[in-house]
Amino acid sequence: MFYNKLEQKRKINFFINKIYHLIFSEKFSKKINFNFDKKSRFDLINYVIEKNKYNNYLEIGCHNNEVFDKIKIKKIGVDPISGGNFRGTSDKFFEQNNSNFDCIFIDGLHEYDQVRKDIINSLKFLNKNGIIILHDCLPPSITHQRVPRTRYSWNGDVWKAVVEARTWKDIDTYTVLSDQGLGIIKNK
């Protein structure tokens, strides 16, 4: 008898939660119009560049040019330590920048405050039909997102900036389940 009441209560709670989420949760019916079946960030970036016939590219956080070297259009890479062709932080780059970009890839300092600033600054220099791609948006475990960094393989809390950006009125955001999560931001 106790089990039956407990099971009945569980079913009622499940039903109430289902109704609540149908009424109050986000309705998401946007389409990104990408037919993307590859696994890596550089595959997605090159696919987007080719599909949209983009001419220029900005990469924030180049770390040994792992992605940067695979991009075959006019490009600027920003990194304070290694890779790219602008030695300095993204903040320093944006202070002196006067160019707009078709495609911007953010894979720099994986901390919410900096990623948020990188998104805001990137939006200022994004061409009308351009796209921003962010890496490391879906950490596989709590240790992968812990700030400060405690492990070599690390996503940081990039995901928080992407979640916040979803509330901004003038952009659309998407997350691709690929390569530790790829966030995509476009102007509406």
What is each PLM-predicted segment?
Residues M1-F105, L109-K188:
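A short alpha-helical cap/connector motif
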